Curated annotation (Swiss-Prot):
The keyword Ribonucleoprotein does not apply. In plastids the minimal PEP RNA polymerase catalytic core is composed of four subunits: alpha, beta, beta', and beta''. When a (nuclear-encoded) sigma factor is associated with the core the holoenzyme is formed, which can initiate transcription. The lineage of its organism: Eukaryota, Viridiplantae, Streptophyta, Embryophyta, Tracheophyta. Transmembrane segments: none annotated. Belongs to the RNA polymerase beta chain family. GO terms for cellular component: chloroplast; DNA-directed RNA polymerase complex; mitochondrion. The gene is rpoB. PANTHER family: DNA-DIRECTED RNA POLYMERASE I SUBUNIT 2. Keywords: Chloroplast, DNA-directed RNA polymerase, Nucleotidyltransferase, Plastid, Transcription, Transferase. Gene3D superfamilies: 2.40.50.100, 2.40.50.150, 3.90.1100.10, DNA-directed RNA polymerase, beta subunit, external 1 domain, DNA-directed RNA polymerase, subunit 2, domain 6, RNA polymerase alpha subunit dimerisation domain, RNA polymerase Rpb2, domain 2. It catalyses: RNA(n) + a ribonucleoside 5'-triphosphate = RNA(n+1) + diphosphate. This is DNA-directed RNA polymerase subunit beta.
């Protein structure tokens, strides 16, 4: 049985363990594997031999710390040194030196790499596992056609087909196919060997014609026939070594290299015993595959399910980094060969250090982290986002699928995903189902398969034994589907339980169960596991919720959720956001930027993150939680980070909510809020924006940073220091200069002032002119300057320009247009902010904070929000925090409702407030209109759910255009806020205006104000004076563009006036 056995109680594994273990696997095994593949390199005359001694390779500790690498925009990497020897064969002398091969970017304990100062993460990819797969499809006549597809390690495919006459063909391209006998002969088998190694020789002999015999008479004839069919070459090609090399490169290397996983799969599927180190496709494989295909034709053996996880493999971080390392070594080999040849040609004495350069390895990894689709910038919106990003699984990327070509069956949930890939958490849109998320307990096995843990059930003993099973193994067992908690193993099991067996879901007796799940969260990803009462929600809304939690903005004053699932602490700790003590000791002092801890007689300074910007412009900040003189233990929390409180994840706020319509202001998911949320900074967040400018050396001279900028008003330069850079702590508004910069340029003779011309004519003095190219604060960027960085790269050439970065902090209260959401997919936009006295209020006089539309619940089927809402109210009144595991209904029916009502009843008794739990309408209460003081007609659900403020904020989206840039070709306004673009009056907008018959407005929108070059210059003036826009004589630019397009197709479009008289004459003549 595949899997590790562990008798201990299961705990949730480290949530970033997948990434970190993958990188450690690359450093332990992948690095040496690729170095051992590096060949011995000889010169053309075979006098000198170069080789690497892998056993003595060294990785040097990084010269800089992670924090400094981020601050100075450097790569956090380690230098790789290997011993190399140069052997002179004539004298048998050897020169050995330790050479520097290049830098390898390191991974930190959170599973991320720092490249050029940016946190990056490598996504795990799901690929079709190499091997052979049999399937059946109906042709156009409705007859089943059986095919066997051999998939190589590189993703290349070779298809075997069997036709109606039981002849077997190998399809080498979309249009060409050749006989299986020709392919086997071209691979080195003769007819006798073929017939001896197959189970059905009579079928092979049945389609062996005289023509076929001639083709496979010799290996050369078979290769020529194969080449002719594969390359679609006419005539009679001649057998040569170059022809064999071309076939080897184009066909055999791409479609016949199985790799170690492919060899294992082929051996298992075809019952072969070929050694594991033989990773290429052999004639034995082809013949065994053909035999099995014949068996399939006659109904022997099962077909393969291509979407089953046993037929998939995970290309992990280790595989991707190892592939890149191998590619870099191939490039290094070419460099060494070229250098040796050059040294001998110029009669120089080479040394190992002179032959090797670090450029191939360093540039390969830089381009991989910068350009590869599976290497992404780490999303650092909040702590949950950082962890979830590293646990993604993607079907996309090199060798994988694309969003356009993937069909529905690939995107759909498969029974083998159970406990391995979350059935809920995926992206929305074109990539739905193609980007998934690992289940909490899943891990990547040795052969690249996803493994999930189960408890093995013993009949006579209560001892628990934990096994990790791959997808190919667990379908042979009866698996009980989460019928008890791991924490409560002593519970008497039910007589009949739901179970899974061979991809079917059954109900069986408990005595028949072999394995059971270890935890209720086992099937879900981290995002879905943070949703309380998830079993009461529709899966589509749970999907939205797990995505929206990743978009929550860290608030200035975070707050724990009253109702949670218990995973909040683990997520916060594994994200690395809180500061945690590495060893026990005593706090000597605490400051805003560091904590000093004494342990074993030494004082250790622990730096804290201070107002650091994430790549989504959110503020990362740590606040000390320990006081001076306090003794702490190892693992204790020293400081809370963004969106964490007491070491628990805290993404939002517990606010008082009523579900009721209010004057139409919460129509269609709009949300009504109280001004208390603004004035008391309940949903206030800090955002840090980065603005940068570079200084180059131009052909006219270097650009200058200065505070003396001509022709600019003084108040725009008020914040600059003597160097021309904005001062720390300055408050800046839109249009202010952040960095003053002048770029030299040559002026035309006509642009000189008269006195400048005189100086040139008499004294020959060249008057220099400069263009102002300052960094200005764009619209919506007002705030406080909190940091200025001047990054100077080594060797300040024109290719390495100096960069000045200015960081500005903004304080954003919640406002109309911001997006808020709960944890059940209930999202909405703030429509109105009401005064406190106008909000509906409870029977104890408290006004509610938010009013949601109750119609958003029934049709969306996310009833979990109502359970959370009521339990949150009870928890706030009783001062309790609830942690609810999912699927609690397995203990008793209506368990969730009983829990909520019992807590409400207890809160009602303890606080002496009968309105908290009224038996006539439990969970609801009579509330009053704040404007009139009268009660509303119907009782209303009130409660305290956990509401998040999302990163989709109105300040980043609102945009207006009065003047701006135009496209060069169409002369129409550009598109998008970043380009100061305009709104497009599209086809449907035109229909709406046509419905009202507003011809003049339509003409203005489509011509004068858009792409009529002359008319748009007169629009502003005529609007100010109240006149009418003069009617232009010529056509708008887009019409002229159409005319030019038609001319390019040799179609001339002319217009001329036809009078009524001429029209009648022409009609009479006709």
């Amino acid at each position: 049985m595949l899997g590790d056995e562990n008798g201990e109680m299961s705990t949730i594994p480290g949530l970033n363990q997948i990434q970190f273990e993958g990188f450690c696997g690359f450093m332990d095994r992948g690095l040496t594997e690729e170095l051992y593949k590096f060949p011995k390199i000889e010169d053309t005359e075979q006098e000198i031999e170069f080789q690497l001694f892998v056993e003595t390779y060294q990785l040097v500790e990084p010269l800089i710390k992670e924090r400094d690498a981020v601050y100075e925009s450097l790569t956090y990497s380690s230098e790789l040194y290997v011993s190399a020897g140069l052997i002179w064969k004539t004298s048998k002398d050897m020169q050995e030196q330790t050479i520097f091969i290049g830098n390898i970017p390191l991974m930190n304990s959170l599973g991320t790499s720092i490249v050029n100062g940016i946190y990056r993460i490598v996504i795990n990819q799901i690929l079709q596992s190499p091997g052979i797969y049999y399937r059946s499809e109906l042709d156009h006549n409705g007859i089943s056609v059986y095919t066997g597809t051999i998939i190589s390690d590189w993703g290349g495919r070779l298809e075997l087909e069997i036709d109606r006459k039981a002849r077997i063909w190998a399809r080498v391209s979309r249009k060409q196919k050749i006989s299986i006998l020709v392919l086997s002969s071209a691979m080195g088998s003769n007819l006798r060997e073929i017939l001896e190694n197959v189970c059905y020789p009579e079928i092979f002999l049945s389609f062996l014609t005289d023509k076929e015999k001639k083709k496979i008479g010799s290996k050369e004839n078979a290769i020529l026939e194969f080449y002719q069919q594969f390359s679609c070459v006419g005539g009679d090609p001649v057998f040569s070594e170059s022809l064999c090399k071309e076939l080897q490169k184009k066909f055999f290397q791409q479609r016949c290299e199985l790799g170690r996983i492919g060899r294992r799969n082929m051996n298992q599927r075809l019952n072969l015993n070929i050694p594991q180190n033989n990773t290429f496709l052999l004639p034995r494989d082809i013949l065994a595959a053909a035999d099995r295909l014949i068996g399939m034709k006659f109904g022997m053996g099962p077909l393969d399910d291509m979407n089953h996880l046993k037929n998939k493999r995970i290309r992990s971080v280790a595989d991707l980094l190892q592939d890149q390392f191998g590619l870099a070594l191939v490039r290094l080999e070419n460099v060494v060969r070229g250098t040796i040849c050059g040294a001998i040609r110029h009669k120089l004495i080479p040394t190992p250090q002179n032959l090797v350069t670090s450029t191939p390895l360093t540039t390969t990894y830089e381009s991989f982290f910068g350009l590869h689709p599976l290497s992404q910038v780490l999303d650092r919106t909040n702590p949950l986002t950082q962890i979830v990003h590293g646990r993604k699984l993607s079907y996309l990327g090199p060798g994988g699928l694309t969003g356009r070509t993937a069909n529905f069956r690939i995107r759909d949930i498969h029974p083998s995903h159970y406990g391995r890939i979350c059935p809920i958490d995926t992206s929305e849109g074109i990539n739905v189902g193609l980007i998934g998320s690992l289940a909490i307990h899943a891990r990547i096995g040795h052969w690249g398969s996803l493994e999930s843990p189960f408890y093995k059930i013993f009949e006579r003993s209560k001892k628990a034994q934990m096994l990790y099973l791959s997808p190919s193994r667990d379908e042979y067992y009866m698996v009980a589907a989460g019928n008890s908690l791991a924490l409560n193993q002593g519970i008497q099991e039910e007589q009949v339980v739901p179970a899974r067996y061979r991809q079917e879901f059954l109900t069986i007796a408990w005595e028949q169960v072999h394995l059971r799940s270890i935890f209720p969260f086992q099937y879900f990803s981290i995002g879905a596991s943070l949703i309380p009462f998830i079993e009461h929600n529709d899966a589509n809304r749970a999907l939205m919720s797990s995505n929206m939690q990743r978009q929550a903005v860290p608030l200035s004053r975070s707050e724990k959720c009253i109702v949670g699932t218990g995973l909040e602490r683990q997520v916060a700790l594994d994200s690395g956001v809180p500061a945690i003590a590495d060893h026990e000791g005593k706090i000597i002092s605490t400051d805003t930027d560091k904590i000093i801890l004494s342990g074993n007689g030494d004082a250790l300074g622990i730096p804290l993150v201070m107002y650091q910007r994430s790549n989504k412009n959110t503020c990362m900040h740590q606040t000390a939680r320990v006081r001076r003189g306090k003794c702490i233990k190892k693992g204790q929390i020293l400081a809370d980070g963004a969106a964490t409180v007491g070491g628990e994840l805290a993404l939002g706020k517990n606010v008082l909510v009523a579900y009721m319509p209010w004057e139409g202001y919460n129509f269609e998911d709009a949300v009504l809020i109280s001004e208390r949320l603004v004035y008391e900074d309940i949903y206030t967040s800090f955002h840090i924006r980065k603005y940068e400018i570079q200084t180059h050396v131009t052909s006219q001279g270097p650009e200058r940073i200065t505070n003396e900028i001509p022709h600019l008003e003084a108040h725009l330069l008020r914040n600059l220091d003597k160097n021309g850079i904005v001062m720390l702590g300055s408050w800046v508004e839109t249009g202010d200069i952040l960095v003053g910069k002048l770029t030299p340029q040559v002026a035309k003779e006509s642009s000189y002032a008269p006195e400048d011309r005189l100086l040139r004519a008499i004294l020959g003095i060249q008057v220099s002119t400069s263009k102002e190219t300052c960094l200005k604060l764009p619209i919506g960027g007002r705030g406080r300057v909190i940091d200025v960085r001047w990054v100077q790269k080594k060797g300040g050439s024109s290719y390495n320009p100096e960069t000045i970065r200015v960081y500005i902090s903004q304080k954003r209260e919640i406002k109309v247009g911001d997006k808020v959401a709960g944890r059940h997919g209930n999202k909405g936009i703030i429509s109105k902010i009401l005064p406190r006295q106008d909000m509906p209020y409870l029977q104890d006089g408290r006004p509610v904070d938010m009013v949601f539309n109750p119609l958003g619940v029934p049709s969306r089927m996310n009833v979990g929000q109502l359970f959370e809402c009521s339990l949150g109210l009870a928890g706030s009144l009783l001062d309790r925090h609830h942690r609810i595991a999912p699927f609690d209904e397995r203990y008793e029916q209506e368990a969730s409702r009983k829990l909520v009502f019992s807590e409400l009843y207890q809160a009602s008794k303890q606080t002496a407030n009968p309105w908290v739990f009224e038996p006539e309408y439990p969970g609801k209460s009579r509330i009053f209109d704040g404007r009139t003081g009268g009660p509303f007609e119907q009782p209303v659900i009130i409660g305290k759910p956990y509401i998040l403020k999302l990163i989709h904020q109105v300040d980043d989206k609102i945009h207006g255009r009065s003047s701006g840039y135009y496209a060069l070709v169409t002369q129409q306004p550009l598109r998008g806020r970043s380009k100061q673009g305009g709104q497009r009056v599209g086809e449907m907008e035109v229909w709406a205006l046509e419905g009202f018959g507003v011809a003049h407005i339509l003409q203005e929108m489509l011509t004068y104000k858009s792409d009529h070059i002359r008319a748009r210059q007169e629009v502003l003036g005529t609007t100010i004076i109240g006149g009418t826009i003069p009617k232009p004589e010529d056509a708008p630019e887009s019409f002229r563009l159409l005319v030019r397009e038609l001319r390019s197709l040799a179609l001339e479009l002319n217009h001329f006036l036809v009078s009524e008289k001429n029209f009648q004459i022409n009609r009479k003549e006709a």
